[in-house]
């Protein structure tokens, strides 16, 4: 049996240079190769004209450059594109491209499904199968860049921002997320500014500390409730890492971060008559008083079977005004791609659920139905 080839999309620059040392080559050759892969989108070693033929042959014998394929895509009326990315075993994750006047953002997934069980999120209802590999994470960017068109003559890429806000909890896949983000930030990788790469987390505090020790990117935190009692229901990981513990971890992260410019982005989904009262707005402002932040209010995006409704514009406006009375910067997120189920909280993919979460939920619903009848 032939030896399995090394997928170069799995290697950050440190690992790539180690490979080249093993091949008896100088470190700058690894930098050249990364530039071909990430600046120009090249996957055929024979096209890498500044790498000598002998080395190209060595690489072809031991290595490959393989990104997951796009299975299908849908385009929204607002220009948002949702991609279904095939990751093997009949499974798909979803990646969303969001074009704007001054930027083009790609929302990237980190897990097949999600290991957490946030009750307002479609991904969480699908269950969880596994973590994505480095190549499956950066491969989403690489593949969508191909779809949009690498500028092979200049090396200019069509994606300016990446947000780790797709399917999954990134901090539960740090072993792959950190090298993937290293590649995003690397001058020889996707060459993105650390302020243009954002990781969103629901609050796995020990992993947040590890992230802070490893690299500096913009941080968004999923709060969604102003107290532990409600957050235990909406974001069950709160039972393990309650709000004050999470906020302390956030403060530790931004204290040593340049990417965040001294404050974090708080994400707060607006659920009708669940977490959107004026009293809860006052409570949220008090909660965040010692944690420098801006607040991103996210109108809830319904999905089939969701137990929640979207807050009315008047309730969102009233909530926002209360927060601003405390001097907080508040942004109401513009919903993008909801007509193709590509908006925040709507990503589902195609998952073989190892947790049996969806099956258990259906069983419980059937039991309730039988009892009521």
UniProtKB/Swiss-Prot annotation:
GO CC: one term? cytoplasm
Kindly state what the record says about how the cofactor is bound: Binds 1 [4Fe-4S] cluster. The cluster is coordinated with 3 cysteines and an exchangeable S-adenosyl-L-methionine.
Q: Where is the active site?
A: 94 (proton acceptor), 344 (s-methylcysteine intermediate)
**What enzyme class is recorded for this protein?**
transferase
Q: Which superkingdom is the protein from?
A: Bacteria
Question: What residues does S-adenosyl-L-methionine bind to?
Answer: 168-169, 200, 222-224, 301
Q: Which PROSITE patterns match?
A: RADICAL_SAM
Report the GO molecular function annotations.
4 iron, 4 sulfur cluster binding; metal ion binding; rRNA (adenine(2503)-C2-)-methyltransferase activity; rRNA binding; tRNA (adenine(37)-C2)-methyltransferase activity; tRNA binding
> Mainly localized where?
cytoplasm
Q: What's any GO biological process attached to this entry?
A: tRNA methylation
Reactions the enzyme catalyzes: adenosine(2503) in 23S rRNA + 2 reduced [2Fe-2S]-[ferredoxin] + 2 S-adenosyl-L-methionine = 2-methyladenosine(2503) in 23S rRNA + 5'-deoxyadenosine + L-methionine + 2 oxidized [2Fe-2S]-[ferredoxin] + S-adenosyl-L-homocysteine; adenosine(37) in tRNA + 2 reduced [2Fe-2S]-[ferredoxin] + 2 S-adenosyl-L-methionine = 2-methyladenosine(37) in tRNA + 5'-deoxyadenosine + L-methionine + 2 oxidized [2Fe-2S]-[ferredoxin] + S-adenosyl-L-homocysteine
Q: Required co-factor?
A: [4Fe-4S] cluster
Which residues hold [4Fe-4S] cluster?
114, 118, 121
Domain (Radical SAM core): residue spans on this chain: 100-339
Q: Which HAMAP family match?
A: RNA_methyltr_RlmN
Which protein is depicted? Dual-specificity RNA methyltransferase RlmN
What organism does this protein naturally occur in? Answer: Shewanella sp. (strain MR-4)
């Amino acid at each position: 049996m032939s030896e399995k080839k090394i997928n170069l999309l799995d290697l950050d620059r440190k690992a790539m240079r180690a490979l080249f040392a093993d091949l008896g080559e100088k470190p700058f050759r690894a930098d050249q190769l990364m530039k071909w892969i990430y600046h120009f989108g090249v996957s055929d070693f024979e096209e890498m004209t500044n790498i000598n033929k002998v080395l190209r042959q060595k690489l072809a014998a031991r290595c490959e450059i393989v990104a997951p394929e796009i299975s299908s895509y849908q385009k929204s009326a607002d220009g948002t594109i949702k991609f279904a990315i095939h990751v093997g075993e009949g499974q798909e994750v979803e990646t969303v491209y969001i074009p704007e006047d001054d930027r083009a953002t790609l929302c990237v997934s980190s897990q097949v499904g999600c290991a957490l069980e946030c009750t307002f999120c479609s991904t969480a209802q699908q269950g969880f199968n596994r973590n994505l590999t480095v190549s499956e994470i950066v491969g989403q960017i690489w593949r969508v860049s191909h779809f949009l068109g690498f500028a092979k003559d200049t090396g200019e890429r069509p994606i300016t921002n990446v947000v780790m806000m797709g399917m999954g909890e990134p901090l539960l896949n740090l072993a792959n997320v950190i090298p993937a983000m290293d590649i995003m930030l690397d001058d020889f990788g996707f060459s993105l500014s650390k302020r243009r790469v954002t990781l969103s987390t629901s609050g796995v505090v020990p992993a947040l500390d590890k992230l802070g020790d490893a690299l500096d990117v913009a941080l968004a935190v999923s709060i969604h409730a102003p107290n532990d009692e409600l957050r235990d229901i909406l974001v069950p990981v709160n039972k393990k890492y309650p709000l004050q513990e999470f906020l302390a971890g956030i403060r530790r992260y931004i204290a040593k971060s340049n990417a965040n410019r001294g404050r974090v982005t708080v994400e707060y989904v607006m659920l009708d008559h669940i977490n959107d009262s004026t009293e809860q707005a006052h409570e949220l402002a008090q909660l965040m008083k010692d944690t420098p932040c801006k607040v991103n209010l996210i109108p809830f995006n319904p999905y089939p079977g969701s137990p929640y409704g979207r807050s009315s514009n008047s309730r969102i406006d009233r909530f926002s005004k209360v927060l601003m009375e405390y001097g907080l910067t508040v942004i109401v997120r513009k919903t993008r791609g909801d007509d193709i189920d590509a908006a925040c909280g709507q990503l589902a993919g195609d998952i073989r659920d190892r947790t049996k979460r969806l099956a258990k939920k259906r069983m419980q619903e059937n039991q309730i139905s039988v009892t009521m009848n």
